Curated annotation (Swiss-Prot):
This is Cytochrome P450 monooxygenase ascH. It is found in: Membrane. Keywords: Glycoprotein, Heme, Iron, Membrane, Metal-binding, Monooxygenase, Oxidoreductase, Transmembrane, Transmembrane helix. Belongs to the cytochrome P450 family. Ascofuranone is a specific inhibitor of trypanosome alternative oxidase (TAO), and quickly kills African trypanosomes in vitro and cures infected mice. As an essential factor for trypanosome survival, TAO is a promising drug target due to the absence of alternative oxidases in the mammalian host. It comes from Acremonium egyptiacum (Oospora egyptiaca). It catalyses: ilicicolin A epoxide + NADPH + O2 + H(+) = 16-hydroxy-ilicicolin A epoxide + NADP(+) + H2O. GO terms for cellular component: membrane. Induction: Expression is induced on AF medium. InterPro entries: Cyt_P450, Cyt_P450_CS, Cyt_P450_E_CYP52_fungi, Cyt_P450_E_grp-I, Cyt_P450_sf. Heme binds at residue 458.
Length: 512
């Protein structure tokens, strides 16, 4: 006979605990929510603050039904549209709301005044979410887009000279790369521009920032360029997953590690070659230009930090402009009326490549690009975390006019896609692509935020607009027409940026 030294649960008791676990979790969430509600109620009624409407969760405060809904929308390539539906489901004229996931409260807004407070007037009350910081550390080593405070100010100051008027207006450089792009487009054959544009923007970006292009569009470099693009794309997709599920940053990913090492080696080669070339002689191609790695080296930055900043800028410079070009041409291939108007606008040039100033004066082209960015902002969702107890200027109370109290540590999501599709701001046809609307509307600074706003506004926005407009003009000068090989509506694939879920498959037709 054995001697029992302690309690040994039988299978029945273990089963009871397993069955009780969901109930215990639910009770914990409810208790936490009730406690939080009492605290929030007391704090939110200070200084005239009132709570905003709450999203009508089907599973009360767990919020899992809506989370699964967003995941479904992402799989269906309609996630930016789902952001607007979040507000519409919460009531008429709701532009700021409370939202729960596992009992934890966050806020969403598409109100320009609230977005202005977060990005500008109360800039110091808000910081980057910890998930974003961790993601950039894991995937890119850190850098300007994953830091805030003094560290961000320092990175921003180093980067700003790269986007002077002289750098942006260098159409001689753009013309050369436009020729390389055109040489890769066969007449009358299907080509996926979504594959070519990242190569183009990588070539332009590296020459603008480093004084020398990596030559991605050169057939001799295609193998290296393809590997770089594949590695880059995997990193960006992983970053999207990490920001959605921060726990993933703790898990080992051998594929990610290999991609990061390859991109880091690539950046190291670019940095070392650029610094070595600049130290030997001042090449004519670099005269008057701010060569990014060289200037960082002059400031005494360690080589590793230079590589990190270079990779950050390569991500932004390649992907943002490539995504914008893809959006423009997905729609142009469906809109022969727009192509005709753009050809008419280009006709006075007589086939001569436009200058930067001439591109800026092309009114319909500018309106078309503005409308693309309104309907499909490249980054349709952003977020901040309250660095201190603060308030949003409005959105609270039954009429939505009272300020809203935000407790320190609370996350706020703001969607440029939901904002820029508001019918009260852009008309009943706000969901349609209509460039002509820009002949009569003049949205305020925070009613139209395709590149963000405030101190953290995208430093490369003018470069992206110039490149996208210039390359669009050059392709239109080279080809008489373009037809789409895609059927159905635009597929809003969203990772870090919005891209076309089915690529940009088109056929170009030469002028005869």
């Amino acid at each position: 006979m054995g001697l029992s030294l302690g309690y040994s649960p039988d299978r029945g008791s273990i089963g009871s605990w397993i069955c009780a676990a969901p109930l215990i979790l639910a009770l914990f969430v409810i208790s936490y929510r009730l406690f939080q509600s009492v605290i929030d109620y007391r704090l939110s009624h200070r200084n005239g603050c009132k709570p905003p409407p709450t999203y009508p969760h089907k599973d009360w405060y767990l919020g899992l039904h809506h989370v699964f809904g967003l995941l479904k929308a992402k799989k269906e390539n309609r996630l930016p549209t789902a952001f607007s539906e979040l507000f519409d489901a919460s009531g008429p004229d709701v532009h700021t709301l409370g939202h729960y996931v596992l009992g934890k409260k966050s806020y969403w807004t598409r109100d320009p005044e609230n977005i202005k407070a977060v990005l500008s007037s109360k800039f110091n009350d808000w910081g980057l979410p910890s998930a974003r910081k961790a993601t950039f550390r894991t995937c890119l080593g850190g850098g300007i887009f994953g830091v805030d405070g003094k560290e961000w100010e320092h990175s921003r100051a180093m980067l700003k000279p790269s986007f002077t008027r002289t750098q942006i207006g260098d159409t001689a450089t753009l013309s050369k790369h436009a020729d390389n792009l055109i040489a890769r487009i066969p007449e009358g054959e299907t080509v996926d521009l979504a594959e070519l544009f990242p190569l183009l923007t990588m070539d332009v970006g590296t020459e603008m920032l480093f004084g020398e292009s990596v030559g991605s569009l050169d057939p001799a470099e295609i193998k290296q360029a393809t590997r770089f693009t594949t590695s880059f794309d995997y990193i960006v997709q992983t970053m999207s997953k990490h920001m959605a599920l921060p726990i993933l940053t703790k898990l080992r990913d051998k594929t990610l590690q290999g991609c990061v090492e390859f991109v880091d080696d690539f950046a190291a080669d670019v940095v070392n070659r650029t610094i070595a070339n600049e130290s030997k002689t001042e090449k004519p191609s670099s005269l008057g230009k701010y060569i990014f790695p060289t200037e960082l080296a002059k400031m005494g930055l360690p080589e590793k930090q230079i590589r990190i900043e270079v990779i950050n800028i390569m991500v932004a410079g390649r992907d943002t402009t490539a995504a914008l070009l893809s959006l423009i041409w997905w729609y142009l291939a469906k809109r022969p009326d727009a192509v005709m108007k753009l050809h008419q606008e280009l006709e006075p040039l007589g086939g001569r490549p436009p200058t930067g100033e001439e591109v800026k004066k092309m009114k319909y082209l500018r309106n078309f690009v503005n409308e693309i960015l309104r309907l499909h902002p490249i980054n349709p969702l952003n977020s901040r975390t309250a660095a201190k107890d603060t308030t949003l200027p409005r959105g609270g109370g039954p009429d939505g006019k009272s300020p809203v109290f935000i407790r320190k540590g609370t996350q706020l999501m703001f969607s440029s896609a939901a904002l820029q599709r508001r019918k009260d701001l852009y008309g009943e046809d706000a969901l349609d692509l209509r460039p002509e609307r820009w002949e009569r509307i003049r949205p305020s600074a925070f009613e139209y935020i395709p590149f963000g706003g405030g101190p953290r506004i995208c430093p490369g926005q003018q470069l992206a607009l110039t490149e996208a407009s210039y390359f669009t003009a050059r392709l239109l000068q080279e080809f008489q027409g373009v037809t789409s090989e895609s059927s159905g509506p635009f597929q809003e694939a969203f990772a870090i940026l919005v891209t076309s879920g089915d690529g940009v498959k088109v056929k170009f037709h030469k002028k005869h």
